[in-house]
């Protein structure tokens, strides 16, 4: 069995270089919520050195709150901003002799596109118009995945190791109790359930079906490195191969 393990990088965390030795895919911040041209270049070089698949991590323009502020923007604006960010990272990747493989929206853009077909459509169109061979990563079972499929993009359905789930398969908003899982054992058990059994237990106790093609571990978490190592060990013990 294979699984992709991804992390959001280029957001100013000191653990980025070490995480790149443990994950198979990197989602690199493109300047709208975090990072800049130099951090993008550094992350791209480190990812290439470690053989890690590179993806753009576009966001709403929200550096003050790390892309976690809800915004109401016209779909055309979201299309343009997404295309702009993908292109910026794509130029750096190309200049370093690499190939960009995927796009995964960040933060509130990701969450809103999971439920809003218009936003999902704008993002999927931007990805398709830039390069239809790119993989679109989105929340498992979301509108973003459906929009990608409509544009005939390869999609990858994502689950989260350290986030709480609602009964409908969406993530618990960060403003609500249960949004983040701080207990390492609970996060590990949840991840294995999602990957091996295709199910997740919601914060209300309801089991929900999920398709896990890639697992996100947050690089800004206090125990990100230690958890990544434990997760890799758990996968190895169960003959689950981490591969992009």
UniProtKB/Swiss-Prot annotation:
The keyword ATP-binding belongs to this UniProt entry's keyword annotation: yes
Keywords: ATP-binding, Hydrolase, Nucleotide-binding
InterPro entries: Glyco_hydro/deAcase_b/a-brl (IPR011330), LamB/YcsF/PxpA-like (IPR005501)
GO BP of this protein: carbohydrate metabolic process
Enzyme Commission code(s) on record: 3.5.2.9
SUPFAM superfamilies associated with the record: Glycoside hydrolase/deacetylase
A GO molecular-function annotation: ATP binding
Pfam families found in the cross-reference section: LamB_YcsF
Residue ranges of coiled coil: none
Reactions catalysed, as given in the entry: 5-oxo-L-proline + ATP + 2 H2O = L-glutamate + ADP + phosphate + H(+)
Top-rank taxon, per record: Bacteria
Gene3D superfamilies linked to this entry: Glycoside hydrolase/deacetylase (3.20.20.370)
Entry function: Catalyzes the cleavage of 5-oxoproline to form L-glutamate coupled to the hydrolysis of ATP to ADP and inorganic phosphate.
Family: Belongs to the LamB/PxpA family.
Oligomeric form and interacting partners: Forms a complex composed of PxpA, PxpB and PxpC.
Database matches in PANTHER family: 5-OXOPROLINASE SUBUNIT A, UNCHARACTERIZED PROTEIN YBGL-RELATED
Name of the protein described by the UniProt record: 5-oxoprolinase subunit A
Organism: Salmonella heidelberg (strain SL476)
